[in-house]
């Protein structure tokens, strides 16, 4: 060891942890499942039962027992009443009143004239009853008598009648107008193909002969008063522009 030469400050020492390059097997790279607890327990090992403590369940009422609010009678057993006779004391009923026979003063024979003797009818106006609005008595308009006109009479002879219904648009001429052929629908064959054909004539447009189509001037196109070449005319003078004194004259022939 004393003769070894080391470069730098590095010296051989014990590693602090396992080095994967020193093992041919997976080694500590894979962790085995534990044998404690309930989650991720080793399936090849025996596991004891695990228990958990849940929350207290909700109660609808604070007191579930009947308590002293219920007074159970002494004659009530587990199967119901014991069947002993029970008696109660009621009040005294009222005495039945005796029948009172009416005397002579209880009758009014003077009021029996209309019922015992013949009398003229009398009428009175009473007030409207409360059930008048709910009266369901049918009136004359509630009845419908059978008609004596028409074919629906059983005991009457009626002439035949007819009715006109509307035309349906499905499968009718309203749906397809081609189903109603008009005069233009048929193709009429020319009668000249199977009969003697008379001579036929046609009218063409008028033919115009070729000629000079230039516009010829009329009498109004000329101005004879402006012609001065065929008559003597006095001399005419006009005013020209003033030339500048500083303009050089035009010299055409230059002397050598």
From Swiss-Prot:
Q: Which Pfam families match?
A: SHIPPO-rpt
Has keyword Cell membrane? no
Q: Which residues form a coiled coil?
A: none
GO cellular component assignments: cytoplasm; cytoskeleton; motile cilium
Q: What InterPro entries does the entry give?
A: CIMAP (IPR051291), SHIPPO-rpt (IPR010736)
> Which keywords annotate this record?
Cell projection, Cilium, Cytoplasm, Cytoskeleton, Flagellum, Repeat
Q: Where is this gene product found?
A: Cytoplasm; Cytoplasm, Cytoskeleton, Flagellum axoneme
STPGR repeat intervals: 66-92, 181-206, 217-242
| Primary location class | cytoplasm
Protein family (similarity comment): Belongs to the CIMAP family.
Any extra detail in the entry? 'Shippo' is a Japanese word for tail.
Q: What does this protein do?
A: Outer dense fibers are filamentous structures located on the outside of the axoneme in the midpiece and principal piece of the mammalian sperm tail. May help to maintain the passive elastic structures and elastic recoil of the sperm tail.
Note the PANTHER family from the entry: BOREALIN N-TERMINAL DOMAIN-CONTAINING PROTEIN-RELATED, SHIPPO-1-RELATED
Give the protein's recorded name.
Ciliary microtubule associated protein 1A
